[in-house]
Design a protein with these regions (language model features):
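Extracellular "spike/adhesin" assembly and maturation modules
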Residues: 1-160
């Protein structure tokens, strides 16, 4: 599986840009945007929870769960027209909590899993920061296993 991407540097400049573009579309129409602005608007504004964010988070959860051999149901086919329900976002948060718990004994340097709803840039940043840190811890463990030769003498291919 390809390396998952993580976005956890959303800030209020991103929020201001989203508001600016939205107001411009409302007042002057979508066609008033430059090609660059249309691309930003069409492909997921960084400060807005959108299908690309949800798919990226779902994919990261899937990759991490596979590495840890944790069975997990994830959704990675969100579309622009789908609006996640409260139970959808709670399912995402539960998955993130499960993955965080799996490496809790290796690090305490992670934010808390936010509460539902995921409706602020801080909460979105925390979700992806947790996934990034879990993925990083797993890679450190795998690297250390290879250095000590453990991967060559194990009788199975389990990570931990």
């Amino acid at each position: 599986m390809p390396y998952p991407e993580f976005v956890f540097d959303r800030d209020y400049f991103d929020v201001e840009e989203a508001i600016r573009l939205k107001e411009r579309i409302r007042s002057d129409g979508y066609n008033s945007l430059t090609d660059e602005e249309k691309n930003i608007w069409d492909n997921g504004l960084k400060a807005c929870r959108n299908a690309s964010d949800l798919n990226r988070i779902g994919y990261a959860c899937s990759v991490i769960a596979d590495l840890l051999e944790i069975p997990m149901t994830v959704k990675t086919d969100w579309t622009k027209l789908q609006i996640p329900t409260s139970s959808d976002t709670q399912h995402i948060l539960d998955n993130v909590q499960t993955l965080k718990n799996s490496v809790a004994s290796y690090t305490t340097d992670m934010p808390n899993v936010p509460s539902n709803p995921i409706n602020t840039i801080e909460k979105m940043n925390d979700v992806e920061k947790i996934l990034y840190k879990v993925y990083t811890v797993i890679n450190i463990i795998l690297t250390d296993m290879c250095v000590c030769g453990e991967t060559y003498i194990c009788e199975d291919n389990r990570l931990i």
